[in-house]
Amino acid sequence: MGGAVSAGEDNDDLIDNLKEAQYIRTERVEQAFRAIDRGDYYLEGYRDNAYKDLAWKHGNIHLSAPCIYSEVMEALKLQPGLSFLNLGSGTGYLSTMVGLILGPFGINHGIELHSDVVEYAKEKLESFIKNSDSFDKFEFCEPAFVVGNCLQIASDSHQYDRIYCGAGVQKDHENYMKILLKVGGILVMPIEDQLTQIMRTGQNTWESKNILAVSFAPLVQPSKNDNGKPDSVGLPPCAVRNLQDLARIYIRRTLRNFINDEMQAKGIPQRAPPKRKRKRVKQRINTYVFVGNQLIPQPLDSEEDEKMEEDNKEEEEKDHNEAMKPEEPPQNLLREKIMKLPLPESLKAYLTYFRDK
């Protein structure tokens, strides 16, 4: 499934294409997509395919096409502080993007059938926290993953504000999914080859809307134990953050706000991700001449075409010159502020989430 937009050269290029095709429509979703490099969730040797609008599968590891994830993120209408459940959380790519929007006071849970994929997701999550330049630019709701079949969730489990299911849902499982949703919540899942948004408007009332034609593998049916019944799966607890963690969140937030105020006072704009300049397409002006009794179009270069060619050459030269300049190391102002605080080194390390950069 996918192929709706052109392939990108890198993550930013892919996001530009998704925006241009109207799959990404809101700034909040765009920021989350730019912050998480899709290529980081591919196995070594397969990264070249990361920026194509195509699904990817290797063994139990699976990523949906970027256009699908874009529609899902937009349809969920995420807000800070909400609770989210990802049914079939896979590599954790979607859950990590969701966590950037939910912020530190949200709930971010995922359930995945394959234990090796859960381990893969945890490794990718740890790598994002430790190594990504984007981590310090957001307040993050870290996903918690459990192994299990999403059709075996314990009946006394809590409900969620937002739910996504990444596998095809049969009609007879639709109500099971709906019960997991809070009143006022949104559930996005594929039903009968349609990605569907379901809103719970009351205790027993729902509104549904088809978003996109899709093709998903169906949910795996649960296996039964010796008693002939499937074992139930417990979801992660909705834990309250401790005071130490809350202090870290608020210290980092205060420093980040201070940095933003400083930059505004100096007239320094917040750095936006680089956008690629697309070459303008050369257009032709046609003249028409009669040949016998037929009117034949004859292409004629316009002055505007010549100017476009000159502009494109100038842009290529400028891009080449920029590429030849030595890259400046990225500046992490939040880290710099933390390291200047009059605190023991162990506390500074805690405030930086033990990141090395």
Swiss-Prot record:
It is found in: Cytoplasm; Membrane. Keywords: Cytoplasm, Lipoprotein, Membrane, Myristate. The keyword Glycoprotein does not apply. One of its GO terms (molecular function) is ubiquitin-like ligase-substrate adaptor activity. The keyword Membrane applies. Its main location: cytoplasm. It holds the Pfam family PCMT. Belongs to the methyltransferase superfamily. L-isoaspartyl/D-aspartyl protein methyltransferase family. Component of the probable ECS(PCMTD1) E3 ubiquitin-protein ligase complex, at least composed of CUL5, ELOB, ELOC, RBX2 and PCMTD1. Interacts (via the BC-box) with ELOB and ELOC; the interaction is direct and stabilizes PCMTD1. At its N-terminus, contains L-isoaspartate and S-adenosylmethionine (AdoMet) binding motifs. Also contains an extended SOCS box motif, where the Cul-box is separated from the BC-box by ~90 residues, within its C-terminus. PANTHER family: PROTEIN-L-ISOASPARTATE O-METHYLTRANSFERASE, PROTEIN-L-ISOASPARTATE O-METHYLTRANSFERASE DOMAIN-CONTAINING PROTEIN 1. This is Protein-L-isoaspartate O-methyltransferase domain-containing protein 1. It comes from Homo sapiens (Human). The gene is PCMTD1.
